[in-house]
UniProtKB/Swiss-Prot annotation:
Tissue: Expressed in leaves, trichomes and flowers.
Binding annotation for Mg(2+) 1: D303, D307
Species for this entry: Solanum lycopersicum
CDD domains registered for this protein in UniProt: Terpene_cyclase_plant_C1
Protein's name in the database: Terpene synthase 16
Cofactor binding notes: Binds 3 Mg(2+) or Mn(2+) ions per subunit.
Length: 553
């Protein structure tokens, strides 16, 4: 365990030995403050963008309605990250061709199947039976159709429980594509296959995948130049907006002087903004993005305080202060100075959010977020008590608490604030009851975090993760626990899409459900190979550079 001895500020004149993390400083410094005077797109760029958009719309509307060409165009538009301009046209087509997905070859069927499931339609997977032999195995000659194999691989990712044929399809295509990949040399197709094997569309963050796909598409000799030009221009215009947003949020962060006063916390504002961008990137959700970024930033401070810095007595006081949710509580409970900074900063953020929502006559909705914040902090406190009491709970107890410590119930609820009229009181009443789709997303978040960060956390001293809980309860090795937890994560993805198909088209609009799904996608990305939030300088830094700094030429 890594320890440091620090003297707490004047109100608690005692020496306390505290744990500290091994995280590095921010890799960005004041970089994003440089965009304060960024003006956005020029009038000429705006006009060009609008003209190109209408040309793409014509292409989409005029494409043959019953042809593979239409599906290919929809897929390309989605992969290029510009589908948000044509949601109505895409939905209108997909919902009227719901029963036609089984027509065509492997590529056509798999492509249509995936596009329908992405839209929230649970179409049957029986159409794939014609590609299997008498034993139920996929026919080996399919390996000669690389495009079809890739399409089947992507489609099978959207499987739910009981769809054994899709489980088999995923195993088959994963194995065969890995064998085929070296034979494709360094072609654009090889790059797409390699990317899909690591980052399937199911897990994709729109802005990250769009940046990559624009490059793939440009190398395709059959690319449509008009569509490519539109995708590039749209990416760059959005990037300018995102730069300006992050500049404004960075100014807020600097004014809090967090790094100076709370040196133990992870200074990860750009990474948090990237997280929010993964939930929604569209210009109409600018207010929601700013709200969510500030909210997650405060959660990160609180998380670090409960995980490594606060004593049990201090955390008891802070938990009570959160429960009271009153600025006077910091003085009444005599919070330590460093905790007052966090507490007052949190309440200030919520006051600011309330003012933003008042413009839409929706300030009352903030109470839903506050309720979830209180639940989350109480769950953090439970973990602290386990740590100080040297207790390793049973897996069931750990996971019940872990739904809240994942922070995703709180984050998902807060992500809907600032989204406008689409998020109604009925929607918030639904989400605070922790529907299965949200529980599934939270389990994915909790367990992925545990898998990739538990060793580092145990070195410094932390509450037991799901890995330690499972190892102790079932008497297994770390490797065996990892396998079991990976299996639980896979099953949770199935749960998530099962519920998406059930709820889509009910009182909850698809755009709200996508926030929950996108949160799961972000956590998959952040914890793909490492804890990239804590250690962004290894890989995440380069991704953020491409998404938030470097325009496409």
């Amino acid at each position: 365990m890594e320890l440091c001895t620090q003297t707490v500020p004047a109100d608690h004149e005692v020496e306390i030995t505290r744990r500290v993390g091994s995280h590095h400083p921010t890799v960005w410094g004041d970089h994003f403050l440089a965009y304060a005077n960024l003006s956005g797109a020029s009038e000429e760029e705006e006009k060009q963008h609008e003209d190109l958009k209408e040309e793409v719309r014509k292409m989409l509307v005029m494409a043959p309605s019953n042809a593979l060409e239409k599906l290919e165009l929809i897929n390309t538009i989605q992969c290029l990250g510009v589908a948000y301009h044509f949601e109505h046209e895409i939905e209108s087509y997909m919902c009227t061709h719901y029963e036609e997905y089984w027509i065509g070859d492997l590529h056509a069927i798999a492509l249509c199947f995936r596009l329908l499931r992405q839209q929230g339609y649970r179409v049957s997977c029986d159409a794939y039976k014609k590609f299997t032999d008498d034993q139920g195995n996929f026919k080996i000659e399919l390996i000669n159709d690389v495009h079809g194999m890739l399409s089947l691989y992507e489609a099978a990712q959207f499987r739910v429980h009981g769809e054994e044929i899709l489980d088999e399809a995923l195993n088959f295509t994963t194995t065969q594509l890995k064998l085929i990949l070296p034979k494709l040399s360094n072609s654009p197709l090889a790059q797409q296959v390699a990317n899909a094997l690591k980052f399937p569309i199911k897990d994709g963050i729109v802005r990250v995948e769009a940046r990559k796909y624009i490059s793939f598409y440009q190398q395709n000799q059959n690319h449509n130049q008009l569509l490519l030009n539109f995708a590039k221009l749209d990416f760059n215009i959005l990037q300018m907006l995102h730069k300006k947003e992050l500049c404004d949020i960075t100014r807020w962060w600097k004014e809090l002087e967090i790094v100076k006063t709370l040196p133990y916390v992870r200074d990860r504002l750009a990474e948090v903004y990237f997280w929010s961008l993964g939930v929604y990137f569209e210009p109409q959700y600018s207010t929601a993005r700013k709200i969510l970024t500030k909210n997650i930033s405060m959660i990160s401070l609180i998380d670090d305080t409960y995980d490594i810095y606060g004593t049990l007595d201090e955390l008891t006081l802070f938990t009570e202060a959160i429960e009271r949710w009153n600025i006077d509580a910091s003085e009444q409970l005599q919070l330590p100075s460093y905790m007052k900074i966090i507490y007052c900063g949190l309440l200030d953020v919520y006051d600011e959010i309330k003012k933003d929502l008042a413009n839409e006559n929706k300030s009352f909705l903030i109470n839903y977020s506050i309720i979830e914040m209180k639940k989350m902090v109480m769950a953090y406190f439970q973990e602290a008590k386990w740590y100080y009491g040297k207790t390793i709970p049973k897996m069931e107890e750990y996971m019940k608490n872990g739904i809240s410590t994942s922070a995703y119930v709180q984050i998902a609820t807060t992500s809907w604030l600032g989204m406008g009229n689409v998020a109604t009181k009925d929607s918030f009443d639904w989400i605070v009851n922790e529907p299965p789709i949200l529980v599934a997303s939270s389990i994915i978040a909790r367990l992925l975090n545990d898998l990739l960060s538990h060793e580092e956390e145990q070195k410094r001293g932390d509450a037991p993760s799901g890995v330690e809980c499972y190892m102790k309860e079932y008497g297994v090795t770390k490797e065996e626990a990892h396998i079991k937890i990976r299996n639980t994560i896979e099953n949770s993805w199935k749960d998530l899409y099962e519920e998406y198909f059930k709820v889509n088209g009910t009182i909850i609009p698809r755009v709200l459900l996508m926030c929950i799904i996108n949160l799961a996608r972000v956590i998959e990305f952040i914890y793909k190979d490492e804890d990239a939030y804590t250690f962004p300088k290894n890989n995440l830094k380069d991704v953020i550079y491409r998404i938030l700094i470097d325009p496409i030429i």
